[in-house]
Amino acid sequence: MANHASADKRNRQRITRTARNRAIKSELRTTVKKARTALKGVPQESAAPVTAAVSALDRAASKGTIPAKRASRVKSRLALALHKASVAAKTAAS
């Protein structure tokens, strides 16, 4: 138990922030996983989930939930995978 009111308040804030960050990270992981799964399927249909994942990564990074460099790294890898999938689809169609 906290000995000071300020310590008690910090504890309440920690609990609130932890819960918020946990929810954001969980949603983020789900969104990125959906994007990666979509990339294994039809490339034309995978652009929307990748865009949603990029948006979620940007939101999480701007709020400080995840580091900005981690968001950038994951976005880069998703974009590269999307590009490879679209190139593979174009060469297969030719």
From Swiss-Prot:
MF terms (GO), sorted A to Z: small ribosomal subunit rRNA binding; structural constituent of ribosome
Pfam families, alphabetized: Ribosomal_S20p
Domain of life: Bacteria
Membrane-crossing residue ranges in chain numbering: none
Disordered as annotated region, ranges: 1-20
Family, per entry: Belongs to the bacterial ribosomal protein bS20 family.
Protein name (Swiss-Prot/TrEMBL): Small ribosomal subunit protein bS20
Gene designation: rpsT
